Amino acid sequence: MWKEFKEFAMKGNVIDLAIGVVIGGAFGKIVTSLVNDIIMPVVGSLVGKVDFSNLYINLSGQQFNSLQEAQAAGAATINYGLFLNNLINFLIIAFSIFIVIKQINKLKNFTKKKEEVKVEATEKDCPYCYTKIDIKATRCPHCTSVLEEATN
């Protein structure tokens, strides 16, 4: 059983997946920082110095100065500012993955076109009965017509 597990774990796909998960986690942290520390402060200052991470709807009826105070008091809140941050975070990650996948597909298609081997014709049409015959034939096996040229 250990041998089978070792073979499974050492296959290229499993290792590639593990590397992808680690890199994806690190990339997610970078994008989260980009959204929270760079994009949202700029957007917030453009719309009137608003901190999006502190935008919420208080459902408890009490007054709180910040989302953190409301959460510490156990108040029910709808945290739409955090949702906006996460939505922008998702859109950036989704767009980045789209660009990467698009480039990978372009590279695959480019290499596939290079690998395509030019296929030589092995058949031709008889000019008299229009059936497929060997390209080197001098006489049609179907209608027995003599062909003028054997094309190669």
Curated annotation (Swiss-Prot):
Keywords: Cell membrane, Ion channel, Ion transport, Membrane, Transmembrane, Transmembrane helix, Transport. Coiled coil: none annotated. One of its GO terms (molecular function) is mechanosensitive monoatomic ion channel activity. NCBIfam families: mscL (TIGR00220), PRK00567.1-4 (NF001843), PRK13952.1 (NF010557). The keyword Transport applies. It comes from Clostridium perfringens (strain ATCC 13124 / DSM 756 / JCM 1290 / NCIMB 6125 / NCTC 8237 / Type A). Homopentamer. Belongs to the MscL family. It is found in: Cell membrane. Its main location: membrane. This is Large-conductance mechanosensitive channel. GO terms for cellular component: plasma membrane. Gene3D superfamilies: Large-conductance mechanosensitive channel, MscL, domain 1.
